[in-house]
Amino acid sequence: MGPTAAGKSDLGIELALALGGEVVNADSMQLYRGMDIGTAKVPLEQRRGVPHHLLDVWDVTRAADVASFQADARRVIDGLLAVGRTPVLVGGSGLYLRAALDDLTFPGTDPAVRARWERELASRGAPALHGELARLAPRAAAAILPTNGRRIVRALEVVELTGTFEATLPEHRSVYDVVQIGIDRTDLDERIVERVERMWGAGFPDEVRRLAEMGLREGRTASRALGYAQLLAWFDGAMDSAEEAKQATITATRRFARRQRSWFRRDERIVWLDQPDVTQVLRLVGSL
C-alpha cells in the first residue's frame, strides 16, 4: 500500500511469486473494465503468471460501492486461504484496503433516497445541502467540505436511512493475520511526472475517447478518476489542449498522493519502506 506511482504493483507480483500467492487488487479505479492505461493496470503479459483478482469487474457507468468490494474481496481472500495460497493485496485506496482487511461495516443504500438527494444537489447546490447536513448531523458536516457534493449526498442518505452518521472510521482492528507494508519514496513527484508522460505516450487520450463512447461521462465515480476527468474536460472544451490536460493530471495526481500519504500514515500497523525491496519485505514477513 502507499501513494500512487510508488512501485506497489511490481512488488506485489514479486511477493506473490516468493510466497506462493496471488494478487488481490485493492485499487478502486482498477476495478473498472477498460480503465487500463490511466490506472497503470499491469498488462497480462507482465504479470509473470501470477493470478490477479478483482481487476476489470465493473463497467465505467457503475458507481463505486465499497461494501460490494468488501464482500468480493473477502470471498477471494477466504478462497485463497482455504487452498493454502497467500493473498497479496495491492492498492492505494485506503478505505478499500481497510474494508477488505479490517472489522468495518457499511450502511446500506437506497437508490430512491440517493436519487432524491442528488436532485436536491442539482437544484440547490452543495453548500445548501451541506447546511442541511450540518443541521441533521453536525459531526458529519464538520468532516466534509461544503463543496464535496458526492460525499454530502451520501451522508444525507445514510442519515435518512439510519438516523445517524459516524464521521470517523472505527479503530484499526484486522479480521485476518496481516503484514502491512507501505511503500513511499522521496522521488515520488518525479515518478508521477514520468508515469503521466508514459500514459500519454501509450495512447491514454484514445483510451478515454473509447470509454466516453461507452458511457464514461455518466459514471459518477469513473468519470472523476485522475487523468480521465482532465481529458474529459479537454474533450468538452473546458481545457484548451491535451498538454493542459496532462499538466492538470500531474498536479491533481501529486495532490492525491499527498492525501494518500496522510491517510496511510495514521495507521501505525504499517511498516514503511522507501524502496519496493522484496528481500526486505520477506525478512519482515518472516520476523512477524
UniProtKB/Swiss-Prot annotation:
Annotated NCBIfam families: miaA (TIGR00174)
Quaternary structure and partners: Monomer.
One GO MF term attached to the UniProt entry: tRNA dimethylallyltransferase activity
Key words of the record: ATP-binding, Magnesium, Nucleotide-binding, Transferase, tRNA processing
Keyword Iron: no
Pfam families assigned: IPPT
Primary role: Catalyzes the transfer of a dimethylallyl group onto the adenine at position 37 in tRNAs that read codons beginning with uridine, leading to the formation of N6-(dimethylallyl)adenosine (i(6)A).
Region (Interaction with substrate tRNA) residue spans: 27-30
Enzyme Commission number(s) from the entry: 2.5.1.75
UniProt name for this protein: tRNA dimethylallyltransferase
Record-level GO BP terms: tRNA modification
Cross-referenced InterPro entries: Dimethylallyltransferase (IPR039657), IPT (IPR018022), P-loop_NTPase (IPR027417)
Marked site positions, Interaction with substrate tRNA: S93, R114
Residues bound to substrate: T4, A5, A6, G7, K8, S9
Species name: Frankia alni (strain DSM 45986 / CECT 9034 / ACN14a)
Domain of life: Bacteria
Reactions accelerated catalytically: adenosine(37) in tRNA + dimethylallyl diphosphate = N(6)-dimethylallyladenosine(37) in tRNA + diphosphate
Swiss-Prot/TrEMBL cofactor(s): Mg(2+)
Annotated binding of ATP, by residue: G2, P3, T4, A5, A6, G7, K8, S9
Record family assignment: Belongs to the IPP transferase family.
